[in-house]
Amino acid sequence: MRHWLAGLMLLIAPSAFAQQAVPNIAFDSVPNPLKLPPNMYFGEVSGVSVNSKGHVFALSRGNTSGPAYAAAATQLLEFDAKGAFVREIGKNLYAWSFGHTVKIDPQDNIWVTDKGSDMVIKFDPEGRVVMVFGRKQEASDEDTAPLKHPKPPLPAEDGRFRQVTDVAWDKAGNTFISDGYINSRVAKVDKDGNWLKSWGDRGKEPGQFNTPHSIATDANGNVYVADRGNHRIQVFDGDGKFLRQFTIDIPVPPGAKPAIGKIPDEAMMAGGTFFPGSPWSLCITPPPNQVLYSSDAWPGRIYKLSLDGKVLGILGQSGKQLKQFGWIHAMACPSENVLYVAELLNWRVQKLLLKP
């Protein structure tokens, strides 16, 4: 019996010790980090990014001149390094429909993905449109209608997106686009906007996706994809060769409450979106010592990981107070211990100062 118990302990100990070894990271949330002008309000904040000057860009679905899921809901807002409002970029832009993410490239160009219009827009640092990808559907288009997609979906096409989600870059200036809710693939275009290739389709195998929802690159040009519906992160080289995948498997703490609705049951979690640890957003810190941050909707945490997928720490929980989260949709990590998080349900951006 004694030997049997010893063997049992050897089997369960690594898992138990691994769970105990994941620390909770202490952190603060800066009150009111982004200061809007009077009579301007955030709606759902779906994107956040930071440029080389420390200016913060927030993508909000707060424009009330149109329906919640139609033209003009998107607003792209810029704040200086102290959080003071600078300007709105792209007001009344043709592509605006249902903004998904905003990202700043190494040259401080501003990129926005719009899920509703199926478009990616590149602005220069002054806020002028310099490149567009995809095409917005119009009422005159054959076999389709505005803001709708046929079922079953049409075959994926080069240069056309269907509910596109995010962008990232490598050192050569190539852009990687996660596309998205329908096409379930990653696209690659060069610095001049020429379509190079795409990889992936809908499925569960390595190299397949179920809602590639966020994308990031490391200093070596590897591409990290938040495969949200399959509750995993997949890693590829810059040509789309599958390298590895990993999942975040940290138990939900007792007493955890969802940000909205009931606690997800097995059927709800089976869809992937609300599976604990399922990645909604990714960001990778600058070199030389890069780490990966990922967020989930349930139980509403942020995870700090090494680039090979080891969970180094966790922080936060669902809720409405500072240091709590309501569906983090995007993150920016200008340094290892400073995070900006964009929340859908709480209509805000939080600035987090980590104290590991």
Regions found by a protein language model. Give the residues of each.
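N-terminal signal peptide c-region/cleavage motif recognized by signal peptidases
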Residues: 13-14
